[in-house]
Structures are given as C-alpha cells and as structure tokens.
From Swiss-Prot:
Location (main, coarse): cytoplasm
Domain Helicase ATP-binding span(s) in chain numbering: 300-503
Pfam families attached to this UniProt entry: DDX23 (PF25430), DEAD (PF00270), Helicase_C (PF00271)
Biased composition (Basic and acidic residues): 31-56, 93-129, 669-679
Composition-biased stretches (Low complexity): 63-83
Residues that bind ATP: 313-320
Position of sequence motif DEAD box: 426-429
Database matches in SMART domains: DEXDc, HELICc
UniProt free text on domains: The Q motif is unique to and characteristic of the DEAD box family of RNA helicases and controls ATP binding and hydrolysis.
EC code(s) of this entry: 3.6.4.13
Organism name: Chaetomium globosum (strain ATCC 6205 / CBS 148.51 / DSM 1962 / NBRC 6347 / NRRL 1970) (Soil fungus)
Keyword annotations: ATP-binding, Cytoplasm, Helicase, Hydrolase, mRNA processing, mRNA splicing, Nucleotide-binding, Nucleus
Protein name: Pre-mRNA-splicing ATP-dependent RNA helicase PRP28
Length: 705
C-alpha cells in the first residue's frame, strides 16, 4: 500500500526559517588561523579568476587579429556581418578597426570587474572589523606621514650640539639684584648702590659710565623723595609728628586695635608719648610696666580727652591700668578733700561683680594712688558696715565696690554721691549675668545730674567736656569695660553713656592667643578623677594650678581627692566667708597652696600670677564662662594650657567650643569634637540653665550630687 506524502507543517517550516535567519544574522566567531586560511583561499581564487580573465582577453585579441588575410584585406571565410572597408594599417587611428567597439567594451568590463572586486574586498574588511574587531598586530603608523610632519616643523639651530653656548661672565648679573624702591621698614644703603654702579662700569666699557651715573642720580632722587615723605621708615623709627595716616593704620593692625566713634585720638606708641604727668610716669616705671598693652595704648588717650568709653577686650589684657591712670589724672585736677567736702562722697567710683575682683582692683589702685596722696577704699560683702563706715570717716577720692553692698550703704545713708564725677564699670557683662542690673541702675540713678554730659555732638568735643562747671565741677565721665557685649549691657551703655568711643582689642569673646586649649572626652566622675591625677603627676605643669567645677559640693569633693594625692589644695566658692576667700587667694599667691579648686566665682577678674594650667573638671554651661575660666592662665604675655573634660551632657556648648578653639593659632580641635553631631550646628534651643553660685546642686555635677 503506497503511503501518501504528507504536506509540510507550515508552523514548523516557519520556525525553521526563523532559526536559520537568526543563525545567519548572529555573528560567528572564527579563529585567527581559520580567518587566515579563508583569506588565502579567497585571494587565490581572485588571483586565479584574474589570470583566467586576462588569458581569455589575450585569446580574444589574437582571434580577432587572425580573422583577416594579408593580401587585399578581405576575409578568407564567410563573415556573419558585413565588414567595413579600411585603409592601410599605418593610416588607421585607434578604434578604426572593423570591430571598433569590442576592445573598448572589454576594457571597460575588465575595469568594472576590478572596481567591483575592490569594493567587495573593502566590504569584507569592514564586516570583519565590525564583528571581529581590528587586527591585533596591524600597525596604523605611517612612516611617510611621520617624516613629513617632523620635517615640516623641525627647527634648526645656528650652532652645532658640540658648541659652547654658555654666556660669558657678567659682573652686573653676578650678584642678586636689589630693589631700589624704599618700602616701609626697609632702607637701601648707599654702599649697595655704589657697588652696583661700579659693576656696571666694569661690565660695559662703552656705555657703562653713563648708565652708572643715571643709576646714582635715580638713587639720589629716591632718597630725597623718601626723606620728604618720610615713607621709608617703620613707624617705630619715626617721630610722633612724622606719623602719617598709613602709619597709624599699620600700628593699629599690629596691635589688633579697632575703634569706633567720632573724633577719636590716635593711640599712644609708648609711655613717654602718653601725655601722663611726669610723677605718674615715674610710678608706672617703678611698678614695672615697661610697654603699654594694646588696650592701654588705645584707651588712655581717649580717656584723657574726657570722652565716655566702652572697652571690649579679652581677659588678662591690662584693663585695670587702662582705666586707673586716666582716673588719677582726672581727679588730680579737682580740689583736694577737706573737712568741708569729704562728706560729699568720692570723686570716682569703680564697680566690679565680685569681692575678689574688687580687692584686686583696690590693691592695684593703691600702687598708683598712694604716692599721689589719694585714698582708695573698698566696699564689699563679708565685712560689717561699721568697719566700712569707719574706713570712710576721713573721706576717699576713690571707692571700689560691688553693686549689692554699695546699694546697702546708699540705702542706710552711709554714703552719698554729691560730687562723684567719674564712673567705671569693670566686667559689666558679668555684673549683668549675676543679676546686678537693678542695683547697677539704682547706683547710676543716684549720681548727680548737674554735671551730666549732653547727648549731642558736643559730647565728642574734648575741649568743651574738659571745662569746669560753676568753677569747680566737671562733666561726668563714664567708662564701661567688658569682655562681651550682650544686649542688656548695650542697653545700659545707651542709657548712661553719652556718645561713647568704642575700643575693641582682638575679637570680643575669644580666648587669648597665649592659651593652648585642649579638650578630652572623659565621661564619669571616677574617670575624670583618674585623668586629673595623671595630669598633675606628669610633672609638666608647675604650680599654681586652678581646677574649675560647676557646683560648690563638687568643689569640696574634688579638693579632698587632690589632697589625698599629696597636693596642698584650697577651695573658693560662694559659701566661703570673705575672710576664707581672702585667705585662700593669699595662700595660692604666696605659694603655700599649689592647687586652687573653684567655681565660676574665680572665673573672672581674679589675677593669680604665673598660673601654668587651668583644668575644667566640668565644662561650664556657656562659652563666655569658658573664655573667662581659661583666661586665668596665659596672662601678662606668658603662655599657659587649659584642659577641658567633656561629656555628652555638654552638647549645648560643643559647637561654640569648636568655633573658639578653631580660631586659636596654637590650639587644635580634637577629631572627636570635630566629628561630634552636636558640634556640627548651633543648637536652636536655648543653652543650658545658668548656674547660680549661691545655689546648692544645680548644673552638671555628675554622680557626686
């Protein structure tokens, strides 16, 4: 039985064709040897085809030449076409043969075949490069192009490589040239110019004489111009009358002095140029003040012109002498105290926030006021009112007081201000921080108003403000010294000061550059005690040393531990009586005690000489308190170190702490503080609660509370 042939499966056939098409379109990798073999076979075939075409062409030409006889030019055989008669062979032109077009067509066909073959070879090469990449060992370097390019841009020197092209010795250029322009602080000597002129004469025999003469003439003109303008000398080498505006600007920049206000005099360069009385200058020399500090250079000339003044300076900058010396000049021109006017009150009043600072100012003032015959009395808490009333029985030209106790004396009629005409507020920002704004306002309101300055431009006129009122009184002069300028301090200054001159030394609120600030992250009281013991036992720091804590209870506990380590220690905090405070400071100053453990009570204004180290056992809650704590060291131009223990509870002040350390040229921000999350941006909420030294256990006291 015959089987019938089944029809092809159409879907299968379509799938087969699709697979073949996909396989054909898919690039196939061919090994290099196979490619070389295929190329050789293709080249051989092409060569064989070319030879075959050439042989066929030659045979065709021979056959066409043998188709005519040699006698009459007629064909011996029959021809399928009629031949055209021709002349002799020598007279024929190319193409005049009986078959003129056949040879040309063959040549054109041959040329077309060659072009087609060349195009096919190029297409094949492009396909190979597209799917298999370029030949690995094929070089694209063209020696012909390279030779053309280098030959076209080649530069030929006028000498051979063996020639000596070094320049001969020239005495003019044998020495380093010096500028003939005379700059500030530098002076060109005549010897240098003469030596240069002589070198020009020796090096240039033809025109050297003329050039040297012009050089000397130019130098002489420059020297004469410099002498006329006095431009070439440093400000320290000039006389006072030769100082120009540019010199004063350089002077202020050198000492970091910035002033604001109208009709401000120039700073003083030395004590001799201060216009202070000779007797007072002798006292300054005896006390040991060799050179004035920046705040003294700027503030004393302003104060001598009877101007109100706001002095903003870092701690330890010599502010006390800056306001004491003009004060003594002022009251020395007033009538002396007698039996008739001694009960009218003092001539000058100095206010300070703490008892210790008051006593320090009193001690400093007596150095200058005692030889001049002036009396200085301090009024502070801790002493009975009877003692202070007894001290005032003979009157006093200068009173130094804390605001609280002075208000008590005013309310009990122990003191009046009928002739007070010179007011100084030292550490004004600290007085505001401690809540003395109301007592301070009461004191300033109790001053006489008859000699108050007008709030006009006349307050900037030194001649008008230096006049006497009614033959004996003078206009009241008010000064305020502070390390920072919070809004409440600005409010008081605006109310009680008249057109004040503002003197800023450095940047307000920054630590002095003589203090190296170190920060260590130490959490927990026990770890901090061990670290403090390591620091004290290292032997790197000589006494005295001050350790600051935040609360009074910590003060006693830390002092007890330090004593157990073998160090003589005293404490200073708000619960101490005045006698105990004075005894503690005296023992540290005379060397009986090596270490002082204190709260922020000793953070401002307390001057203990040669403090080598300050340790912040607890970081204060404000950066201002930190600044004043570390300001106890590095005073009077000496260097010091401040070490601060930080914990996570101090996150509110980490940003400000990082900023103030980064501004110091001798301090380095530790990596842990720099990368701490709280130090990246200023906290939006308010800082930590301010510590009240009279309180019990407020603040960050740790586990000892």
């Amino acid at each position: 039985m015959d089987r019938r042939r089944l029809p092809p499966d159409l879907p299968a056939l379509l799938r087969q064709r699709e697979a073949e098409r996909a396989a054909a379109a898919k690039p196939r990798f061919i090994p290099k040897k196979e490619r070389e073999r295929m190329a050789a076979e293709k080249a051989a075939k092409e060569e064989e085809e070319r030879k075959r075409r050439e042989e066929a062409l030659i045979a065709q030409r021979h056959s066409s030449a043998n188709g005519t006889n040699g006698s009459n030019g007629y064909s011996s055989g029959k021809s399928t076409t009629n031949s055209i008669p021709t002349g002799p062979k020598a007279m024929r032109h190319p193409g005049d043969s009986g078959e003129p077009e056949h040879g040309g067509k063959r040549r054109r066909l041959n040329d077309n075949d060659e072009k087609r073959a060349e195009m096919e070879r190029k297409d094949a090469a492009e396909l190979r490069a597209k799917y298999m990449g370029p030949e690995v060992n094929q070089s694209t370097f063209s020696a012909k192009k390279k030779r053309k390019r280098t030959a076209a841009n080649k530069f030929n020197f006028d000498w051979d490589p063996e020639d000596d092209t070094s320049r001969p010795f020239d005495p003019v250029y044998a020495e380093r040239p010096e500028s003939l322009v005379r700059l500030a602080g530098y002076e060109n000597t005549d010897e240098l110019v003469l030596r240069k002129a002589e070198a020009i004469r020796r090096g240039d025999p033809e025109t050297g004489e003329e050039r040297a003469r012009k050089l000397l003439e130019q130098h002489e003109r420059v020297k004469q111009a410099a002498e006329r303008k006095n431009f070439g000398k440093h400000w320290s080498e000039k006389k006072l009358e030769d100082m120009k505006e540019r010199d004063w600007r350089i002077f202020k920049e050198n000492f970091g002095i910035a002033t604001k206000g109208g009709a401000i005099p120039n700073p003083m360069r030395s004590w001799a140029e201060s216009n202070l009385p000779r007797r007072l200058l002798e006292i300054v020399e005896n006390v040991g003040y060799d050179e004035p500090t920046p705040i003294q250079r700027a503030a004393i000339p302003i104060a001598q012109q009877a101007r109100d003044l706001i002095g903003v300076a870092v701690t330890g900058s010599g502010k006390t002498a800056a306001f004491l010396l003009p004060l003594l000049v002022y009251i020395s021109e007033l009538p002396p105290l007698t039996e008739f006017n001694k009960n009218d009150g003092p001539y000058a009043l100095i206010l300070a926030p703490t008892r210790e600072l008051v006593q320090q100012i009193e001690t400093e003032a007596r150095k200058f006021a005692g030889p001049l015959g002036f009396t200085v009395v301090s009024i502070v808490g801790g002493h009975s009112l009877e003692e202070q009333a007894f001290a005032l029985r003979n009157g006093a030209e200068i009173i130094v007081a804390t605001p609280g106790r002075l208000v008590d004396c005013l309310e009990r009629r122990l003191l009046v201000f009928s002739q007070c005409c010179y007011i100084i507020m030292d550490e004004a920002d600290r007085m505001i921080d401690q809540g003395f704004e109301e007592p301070l306002t009461k004191i300033l309101d109790a001053l006489p108003v008859a000699n108050e300055k007008p709030d006009t431009e006349d307050a900037e006129n030194s001649q008008l403000m230096s006049r006497y009122l009614g033959g004996k009184d003078r206009y009241r002069q008010t000064m305020m010294y502070t390390a920072t300028m919070p809004p409440l301090v600005e409010k008081i200054a605006k109310k009680y000061l008249r057109r004040p001159a503002i003197v800023t030394i450095g940047n307000a609120g920054e630590a002095v550059d003589t203090v190296e600030q170190r920060v260590e992250f130490v959490s927990g009281e026990d770890k901090r005690k061990r670290r403090l013991q390591e620091i004290l036992n290292s032997g790197q720091f000589k006494p005295p040393v001050i350790v600051f804590v935040n609360i009074k209870r910590n003060c006693e506990m830390v002092a007890k531990d330090i004593k157990s380590w073998g160090y003589s220690t005293v404490t200073l905090h708000g619960s101490k009586t005045q006698e105990q405070r004075e005894a503690s400071l005296a023992s540290v100053r005379n060397g009986q005690a090596n270490i002082l453990v204190a709260t922020d009570l000793a953070g401002r204004g307390i001057d203990v000489a040669d403090v080598s180290l300050v340790v912040n056992f607890n970081m204060p809650s404000s950066i201002e308190a930190y600044t004043h704590r570390i300001g106890r060291t590095g005073r009077a131009g000496k260097s010091g170190v401040a070490i601060t223990f930080l914990g996570n509870e101090d996150s509110d002040v980490m940003y400000d702490l990082k900023q103030i350390i980064s501004k110091s040229s001798i301090s380095k921000v530790p990596e842990e503080l720099r990368r701490h999350e709280a130090a990246q941006s200023k906290p939006t909420r308010g800082g930590g609660k301010k510590l009240d030294d009279s309180g019990g256990f407020a603040g960050k006291g740790g586990s000892w509370q």
